[in-house]
Regions:
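Cysteine protease catalytic domains with a Cys-His-Asp triad
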Residues: 1-129, 160, 166, 207-228
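C-terminal folded domains that constitute the principal catalytic or ligand-binding module
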Residues: 129-221
């Protein structure tokens, strides 16, 4: 969580924790018939290796059973990708057969993550091969989707907040809040810290609360001594 300190670049594990939150909320809301999938950064890592050799990874880490659901119910898929020290959101529209690359540090019309997008789509084809065959028309494939790079994505005001922007986009928050003058990096980072600490997934919550209580009591005691 130290990477959530002001001015720090976000590590992938912070994004992965948020993906677990979003996945859990979606599964509860849809009774395990998730319409939106939130895949974590390990999908990006596998795609950067060998896109065709992923089934063993998916099986060993129970990736598909947690982060995915029946393909027949899926409408869109969020994938955080990193083509090199920069987090980008890949939004796969399953019904529209369109991929949008949401890049908060865009130069020109093409995102630096476009090449990696093709690899991720190939991974999805490999992992979901059986479901695609049974639920989609003949010849249907993720790798055939058209790719777009929206030009209206709010741009980060610095070099280190791409991960914070990516999380906000995947949370489907109002993107106007990311525009210049409304986005406050330190406030957003504090929000994410609080979200992680208060989460039911936080196994060290009681330890953290006890530590915070001791710190508060010590500070309060020091103030009383100083007044005396």
């Amino acid at each position: 969580m130290l990477c959530l300190k002001p001015g720090c670049w976000l590590e992938g594990e912070v994004i992965n924790v948020i993906m677990e939150f979003l996945t859990d909320c979606e599964r509860i809301a849809t009774r395990n018939k998730a319409q939106t999938w939130y895949l974590n950064t390990r999908m990006n890592s596998e795609a950067m290796g060998n896109p065709l050799d992923v089934k063993d990874f998916i099986r060993r880490h129970r990736y598909q059973s947690f982060f995915m659901g029946p393909l027949v119910h899926c409408c869109k898929i969020y994938v955080p990708i990193n083509p090199g020290k920069h987090w980008i959101v890949m939004l796969v529209g399953v019904d529209d057969e369109v991929v949008e690359i949401w890049d908060s540090y865009l130069y020109g019309a093409k995102s630096t993550g476009e090449d990696l997008v093709y690899d991720v789509l190939t991974v999805l084809d490999a992992v979901l091969k059986d479901e695609i065959a049974s639920t989609k028309p003949s010849g249907w494939s993720f790798s055939k989707f058209s790719i777009r790079t929206p030009q209206n994505v709010p741009q980060q005001p610095n070099l280190y907040d791409c991960g914070v922007f990516a999380i906000n986009i995947m949370e489907s928050r109002d993107i106007l809040e990311l525009t210049l003058g409304k986005f406050h990096s330190e406030d957003e980072r504090a929000r994410l810290v609080l979200k992680m600490v208060m989460s039911k997934f936080n196994r060290k919550q009681n330890t953290l609360f006890a530590s915070a209580r001791r710190h508060h009591e010590m500070r309060s005691g020091n103030r009383i001594c100083n007044r005396a």
